Amino acid sequence: TSGGIDSSSVVMSALDVGKEVRVYSFTFGKHFSSDFEAARKLAWEFNLTFVPVFLPSDRDEIVETVKHLIKNVGCKKKTAIECLFPFYYLIKLMKEFKDETLVTGVAADGHFGLSKKAMIHYSKDDQKFKKFRQDYFSNLESAGTKRLIKLCELNKIQLCNPYFEPSVFSLWIDKNWEELNKPRQKEVIRMHYPELDFLKIKPHTNLQLGDSKIAETVGNAVISKYKPNSKSPIGIYNRIAKGVYA
């Protein structure tokens, strides 16, 4: 969990139906991001086992994992690589604990139109906002969902991704942006989980961005390995996919 409302709500829902829950969250070394701290706080509050997933800082290990995600999992886009990177290590740790099911809040953002693009182009127009969500949830590539499914399949882990389910989509597709996000972002979720108000949940941030350092650490590793003067890792990812960088 990131300690945000999406992943925290699935924790609470799992507890509500009597499941045994172990909370995982990732971090680079002792750089504890706000997401990591919030996840730890959530586990503490509800007396759940908390498992820190320590991501590697070694350049060559990061690069080899990126290659695996591109070649074997099928990640093509920069965001998919960066988002799947921590899940690779999380799933490895799950297998050590013999946990069989991964429950995530992945793709929840698609219901709410909180990206910069969605806020500018869709939030004020109900029909455009509806089409944006229909397009988003008709494409398994959204939020790296298809690649996360593949990563779990390769590791024989069952994936439960409730926010991508049609039953959840149908709950909110006829609501406009303000009905979903006022008075707080993702209000239609938050109102049902008042027990999570103590987390003081921050506004939307992509998993790999913010203070997690995932995007910059992964990107800098491949740049350092293959093209030190490059300003972006995108070209390097493409060359790995084409086999230029074996």
Q: What do the PLM-derived regions correspond to, one by one?
A:
Residues 228-246:
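Acidic, carboxylate-rich catalytic segments that either coordinate divalent cations
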Residues 10-14, 42, 86-90, 189-192:
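Structural preference for long, well-ordered alpha-helical segments in enzyme cores
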Residues 1-46:
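ATP-dependent adenylation/pyrophosphate-handling site
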Residues 102, 107-127, 139-230:
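Mid-to-C-terminal catalytic subdomains of enzymes
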Residues 94-99:
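Glycine-rich phosphate-binding loop signature in dinucleotide/nucleotide-binding domains
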Residues 36-73, 104-106, 111:
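A conserved beta-strand->alpha-helix junction
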Residues 77-83:
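Short, flexible loop segments at the rims of nucleotide/cofactor-binding pockets, characterized by
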Residues 1, 22-27, 52-54, 103-106, ...:
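Short beta-strand segments
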